[in-house]
Swiss-Prot record:
Pfam families: UPF0182 (PF03699)
One Gene Ontology cellular component annotation held by this UniProt entry: extracellular region
Subcellular locations according to the entry: Cell membrane
InterPro entries, per the entry: UPF0182
Keyword Mitochondrion attached: no
Record protein name field: UPF0182 protein PTH_1387
Organism of provenance: Pelotomaculum thermopropionicum (strain DSM 13744 / JCM 10971 / SI)
Amino acid sequence: MRQKFRFAAYVLAGFGLIFLALTIAGARLYTDWLWFQSVNYQRVFATIIISDLGLRLAVGLTFFVLLFLNLMLTRRPLLKVSQNSAIIREKDVLTIQSSPLSQLITPKLLLLAFIALSALMAFLFNFTVAGDWITFQKFLHPTSFGIKDPVFNLDIGFYVFKLPFYIFIYKVINWVILVSAFWVLAAYFVVYFIQGNPGAIFRNISARYHFSFLAAIFFGLKAAGYQLEQYSLLFSHHGAVWGPGYTATHATLLAYKVLTYIALLCALAILINLFLRRFKLVIYSIGVLLIASVLLGGIYPAAVQKFMVTPNEIAMERPYLERNINFTRLAYNLDEIEKRYFPAGRVLTAEDIRANQDTISNIRLWDWEPLQQTYGQLQEMRLYYEFKDIDVDRYIVNGRYRQVMVAARELNQEHLPAQAKTWVNQRLKFTHGYGIAMSPVNELTGEGLPAFFLKDIPPTGPTDLQVTRPEIYYGEASDQYVIVNTRSQEFDYPKGEENVFSTYEGDGGVRVANFLRRLMFAFSLGDYKLLLSSEVDNNSRVLYYRNIRQRVPKIAPFLQYDNDPYIILSEGKLYWMWDAYTTTDKFPYSEPYNKNDNYIRNAVKVVVDAYTGKVDFYISDSSDPLVLTYSKIFPGMFKPLDSMPEDLRRHIRYPVDLFKTQAKMYAVYHMEDPQVFYNKEDKWNLPTEIYASEEKPMEPYYTVIKLPGENKPEYVLILPFTPQNKKNMIAWLAARSDGENYGKLISYSFPKQELVYGPMQVEARINQDTTISQQLTLWDQGGSRVIRGNLFAVPIKDALLYVEPLYLQAEQSRMPELRRVIVAHGEKVVMEPTLDKALEKIFGEGATVQKSVQQPVDVTQPQPEKSIAELANTANQIYDEAMKKIKAGDWAGYGEDLSRLKQVLAELAERAGK
């Protein structure tokens, strides 16, 4: 009785767990539907769900039916075998003994077992097709590339949209046949093994017919597989060529055609054998195909490669190298790069510097890594605020085109004190970040700190930039769901010793509305307190999927995304802009950039409202067939770029990830001559630089410059190139970001007969300068860490100006200060407290017409001595000013006062020591 009760309890618990799992899954599906409705992408959700479930259902049913039919074919022979009786002779007595299997294997039991096994295998197999719904949809909505491959003369759209689905179908049917063969063999084996005669399986005529039939289907599928493998040659790597070279085109391709016919003949032979009953033909067919595969698919191509191609590789591979070069350039848009000549031999004058003040005033002196620490110390204000990242952008500030560093002040609930991590605080009170900090790339205070355009809470500054909607509910640090419009007001921002509270005024999130939704949210979010809280009512709104790195891919999982979404201030509101890419690994003759994909376009710009969470997708490359196909699959999802608000459009920039990929490929594929390409005679490298104290790859950098031959400064992304195994600069690549020039790439090549210093050569000259090296050593010995910033090669007219900032960071401080600027031009290398002074030292007085950088205190200059009383009085005054700024919430000013106080106290200690 106790055992029956325990068994019943286990069964009940099992059903309870299944019911709970189904309830949670159903709740998540329901709340996802509500979420997609809230962002107006319910059609996208419906398309994804219907496509995914429809494909899974079709594959699952196909798998179930085919496996079940195969198992049912074993039913009669298994029943017959299991009912065989055994005759036992003892002395002169014959005893007929029925098989024990006759009691175990019954028609009903076999039927139930076959249904259960087929259903289980179909269910498990369904997990392998997760995500293949997009392959199916692309198959249904292809777009022509307008380019045909040179081998099969098919449009590239066939390989991108059609071929993946054919491969998918082939794999599914192949697995069905293999799994069916396994379970059919297992069923026969179990019966004969129990009877003690497993070797009799293949003497069973039914089993032999069954396996022959499966083998015939397998060989027929193998023939189809060889046809698909012919197409797959276009994305393979053979010798010096990406894509099919001479061997693949003349040997491997021929081998696949012959193997296709051999596989079909083997399938036909096996079918004929069903009538001839010479079952050795099955074994012979398998042997023939295996031998042919080794000879034709392996040995023959290898022999052609070794004895024909390798001794004459360049001559025989030349036409295929041309294809490789041309198609790779197409795949990465390298064929659109405009080539220009850059003399680089000019020596700049003071007049040149004055004439290019728009460029000079936008040279970036602040690197994002040290600046992130400085922002954190000066502008995070409270421990729960966080600057997740520092972004680079450009704005019209007081009528001038300025490059700036900008960061969103997000709220990170993980940084709340342990005692403050209550449910009410984390879900209802601390719901959003607040405002941004923004500083020009080239300005600093007298203490080596950034000079802010926007700072503090609420955001204020000395410019015409204004933030009217500073709340950040959606960002990069918003990982938890929150509930707004509750009976509790939300914490808005700190103000001195008090806090300001607010209520959400947007339409983001999903209304609780009724008890059913509340219950579903409790299940899907795994939070029963949501169900019990008296602070939440029907008008409350649940904000979830708030992290943009989760929010955007939730809507468009078929796109690839850039590593750096960036914050934008537009008409007083805050937005996130994120670059999205369309990619494929099925572009013929193209070399992959990440060991997989061999085609990429920045076809989509995504904009997310930081307050409401609204997500908009804009097509930034309407010539891309992939994004056109996605537009067919999801009508109305993608908007034309022209419909983006004009002020937001001003902040579109060429994405770094795409630029790095193109630069990496262009370093090789700028060589268009097959002979030069084969020998890698003119291969370029991406340069390295000294950052902090280590040699690291040089990153592309944004800057505002007047490109050679252009009339006005513009926002561009730049990266130099160096020759292979050399350190001098050979060229630089620029990507334009402004207006109608957006997306245009220009390659500037230097004359090969002239030496143009590369980044590491400039770094070496800095290290060899005795004045600079001595000063760096003194700072290191004095307890300060010297951080060498990014080295920038700034093109001005037909010359290059190198600029590298230096930061000092005290051992006990987390706030690096910008203390020196190194400038190199021609044969001169100087280090000065400011960029203006460095330029004047190289080019003479009057090289700069405006002082955009405040004069910092020169830490090496002796100051006029003051009395101890004067110093003490000054320290008290600075301390009082700092306390006032704390009460006013001016944390940047407080940080500056602390730096001043530190210097005065150090001088006071020195005077007291005397």
